[in-house]
Amino acid sequence: MPSDIEIARAATLKPIAQVAERIGIPDEALHNYGKHIAKIDHGFIKSLEGKPEGKLVLVTAISPTPAGEGKTTTTVGLGDALNRIGQRAVMCLREPSLGPCFGMKGGAAGGGKAQVVPMEQINLHFTGDFHAITSAHSLAAALIDNHVYWANELNIDVRRIHWRRVVDMNDRALRAINQSLGGVANGFPREDGFDITVASEVMAVFCLARDLADLEERLGRIVIAETRDRKPVTLADVKATGAMTVLLKDALQPNLVQTLEGNPALIHGGPFANIAHGCNSVIATQTGLRLADYVVTEAGFGADLGAEKFIDIKCRQTGLKPSAVVIVATVRALKMHGGVNKKDLQGENLDALEKGFANLERHVKNVRGFGLPVVVGVNHFFQDTDAEHAKLKELCRDRLQVEAITCKHWAEGGAGAEELAQAVVKLAEGEQKPLTFAYDTETKLTDKIKAIATKLYGAADIQIESKAATKLAGFEKDGYGHLPICMAKTQYSFSTDPTLMGAPSGHLVSVRDVRLSAGAGFVVAICGEIMTMPGLPKVPAADTIRLDANGQIDGLF
């Protein structure tokens, strides 16, 4: 079968105005970026307020492995399949970050015959949203240091400036730096560092804001430093919010593209789920719900990260509620969770599959614990055997009383996911329970962290380092104790040890640091060795990305 980029390049794309027309977006509401990409105007989005909303379907997954799960591919395939069976469906996805595109993970536009296109533009600069977010964050950093340089009227303690810088790249060399060296004209030297743009609080605010006014208000709440008498300093205090909102004004308009089958997809915002809250923008999700019968959206990595944050942060703040949840699993990945090495995955191994099933089992039980109906989508690979798929379906039926459906959308497009689409509609139109959360926000911050660790991760307890404990106490003293928790931890395990696969229990979740995201409305708990600035692998994807003799991109995946 051709590569993803070859399939995408061979597709005949519809003019974006035709795609928009299918869901009731008039041509005058589009800001076109070429023939096949457009932004949807703020005014049109506001005109949709009060309209009936469709049903929301959340796609999540088992704990990811290098074998690959295909969550975005399944999201696209399911959206195409829903359209094929007569439902008006829109997909809502996150924008890819340049860091993983040139690192290990690759792009985030789906795969095979279940892709969003134009794939190359989406995976690279797209409409410049990440550039705008990086620029707004960098403007804030410049204004903070400028305020300190010119008399420091706010009495900012330069030892307690929390606002790090960002760049949309994996670059471990920038994790910790010394800035303002070279003499008094360059400011006050201090330690600083960079995070990847998707970990910026500006990205989180961008994705949780309801409109421009809410965006500016949230930006103003961001705590960037402390005074010498330990009082919080916000971006509003340094008068950064107006200019930052101007930089983000156009970016806040959702991006409209299409699938290979010509169905509409909104791609907007892109926080990672291991170091941020992992969901696309609220504006895109709510716009889709007011235009379609079904919105299919994804939450990053496994259900312990993306889905938990989707519910405990995004749904809690907005009132959204999924009508159905799809948990994506693969035979290959479950065998890895059962102890099989990646190079040995080709052969049939029912014992390893059953052992690795514990990972899927916990994810299903966790999602059901939120009161949500679940179906398992088994993403089919050519190397899978019929016996393995039969075994997995049997395990789901007997142990969990949940339906598992084999999906072949990667090879067949929407036609390969029609059975999954029918199951999703049945769940979404069936009995719905009230949404429940993993914790009560009025409990202490440490208790909320412990609730996530013990209820969802299978941990025995949490271990909070003294520095983090002191900061948590300070957050509560300053009035932020009511905020929900955003766990930053490895995506590869329920624990904080990425090598501990399957469904470990009885472990300790180590919290080494915490960060306040007052504008986004949560507290980030940084667990284990997770980094908010990733590094490149030994052999990065960038090594094989180039232009061919015809000026076309080769090696992007």
UniProtKB/Swiss-Prot annotation:
<dbReference type="GO" id="GO:0035999">
    <property type="term" value="P:tetrahydrofolate interconversion"/>
</dbReference>
<keyword id="KW-0067">ATP-binding</keyword>
<feature type="binding site">
    <location>
        <begin position="65"/>
        <end position="72"/>
    </location>
    <ligand>
        <name>ATP</name>
    </ligand>
</feature>
<dbReference type="Pfam" id="PF01268">
    <property type="entry name" value="FTHFS"/>
</dbReference>
<dbReference type="InterPro" id="IPR020628">
    <property type="entry name" value="Formate_THF_ligase_CS"/>
</dbReference>
<comment type="pathway">
    <text>One-carbon metabolism; tetrahydrofolate interconversion.</text>
</comment>
<keyword id="KW-0547">Nucleotide-binding</keyword>
<keyword id="KW-0436">Ligase</keyword>
<dbReference type="GO" id="GO:0005524">
    <property type="term" value="F:ATP binding"/>
</dbReference>
<comment type="similarity">
    <text>Belongs to the formate--tetrahydrofolate ligase family.</text>
</comment>
<dbReference type="InterPro" id="IPR027417">
    <property type="entry name" value="P-loop_NTPase"/>
</dbReference>
<dbReference type="InterPro" id="IPR000559">
    <property type="entry name" value="Formate_THF_ligase"/>
</dbReference>
<keyword id="KW-0554">One-carbon metabolism</keyword>
<protein>
    <recommendedName>
        <fullName>Formate--tetrahydrofolate ligase</fullName>
        <ecNumber>6.3.4.3</ecNumber>
    </recommendedName>
</protein>
<dbReference type="GO" id="GO:0004329">
    <property type="term" value="F:formate-tetrahydrofolate ligase activity"/>
</dbReference>
